[in-house]
Every structure is written in structure tokens, then in C-alpha cells.
């Protein structure tokens, strides 16, 4: 495994949606998620991490060290069993093996981190190991992300659609078309903030510089292999990276996030934004604390 990263990072992702549903809420008929008090649109961290996993799986294709643990339709205990097999352990013998080898917990954790990119990055709860009373069942990952929130309120719209195809023979006799509906956000610019702990990378998962570059690549291409009619047009517009010159960091994260401002290109224009060109993104680099540098990727 490569050497773990040595610097703490924070980052800001700015992405937008045009005539699409960035993250439907199953409790609200799959409407776009909205903060009911402010009208600001929301996209969950789980949604964004899923897209990062999907990108890595697409470009790495299960290459050694870059497999994905949390996959659609794949039982987690199937991957857990691989760790047992690699260390010559079974569910029946695990407790006896643990008495023989006090480092068994760490060995299993290290094997999972070395083989699965998303565990090394985001951490995981591995139920098989929790049930076996192993301390490696919960791994806290060095990369953490919050909810994305739109810069301005969004107004989701319900669009009625028709379908010429008929489902049953009875429907064919009674009607010519079927009705459906879909939800869209006409336009929204979303901001997500994230954190990368070099301390956790060193102590726990071994998240490396190579992993870090893959993470940045995945974020910049978050929606490039995820297009669908439901999501409309989505794109990552900017990735703003703050790098500390130490493992534990040189300043609180909120002070760095506060240097990133998103304002209207024409402040006097009160009409709803409909494109990225309606906004201006600035970073007050002069206000950055000593020991912190900023990089902007697009």
C-alpha cells in the first residue's frame, strides 16, 4: 500500500442542474429535496458518494486495490468472507483465532482497506465483523462530505408527460395514451463542502496521494457517466481545494469555507438564475491563514 497522505484538506464542490432532478426524496414522491423553511435545494452526501463510487468502479473496473465495497445488488458479507478467507478465518473459528492472534482485528481491517477504495476513503460499517465482536467492524474514513445546498431557493416543477405505449390489452380498448409525471428543478447551483483528515488516513485506512488524485478526478467527473433523463443536465463547475501544510491543519475549516463567495453576476437582477453565467465565484485568497494554500480545478 502507498504511503498515506500527510496534509489535511478541505474542499468545496460547486455543481449545477438544469431541467433535472438532482436527488429525489422517496418520502415525497421522488420530488427534488428541498429545505421546507428556506426553499433551498438539497442533495445528500450519500447521493454524491454513490456517484464517486460509480466513477471509480467505471474507470478502475475492479483493479486490485480499487474495488468498491458498497455496490448495487452485491451482499456485503460476500466481500467480508473474502477477508476471512485471505486470513484463513471462518465465522466459526474467528473467536478462537482472535485469542491466538490479538492483531486479527487490525489485520482484517487493513485487508479491507487495502482492497476496497471506498472503505479506504469513506470508511464503512461491516456488519459481519460487528456480529463477530471484532473491533474492525466500523471503520471511520478520512474523507467526509456534508449535504449539498443550493445557493438560492429552487422551485421544483411537476411536469406531466404522456406515453403512447399501453400496458395491458384492456387499456388498449379503453384509452389511447397513459399519463405520467416527473419533477424537475429548472436551474440550481449547489454547493457541497468536504473534509479530508490526514490523521485518520495515517492511523486507520492508509488513504494515499494516489487515492487523493483519483478522488479529485472522480469529483470533477461526478456526473459525466451518470446522465439520465431524470437528472437532466448536471455538471461540476468548480472544485476548490484548501491544502494545509500539516497533518492536523493550520486553521478551522469554517474560516476557509467563508472565503468562498457565490454572488450574482448582476446583483440588481432579481429574476431567477437560469445558467452558471448568472453567478460569480470568488475566493478571498488574501484572507487565507498562514500555512493554507488554495487550488481551483474545473
Residue map of PLM features:
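RNA-binding basic/glycine-rich loop and surface signature characteristic of RAMP-family CRISPR effectors
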Residues: 1-298
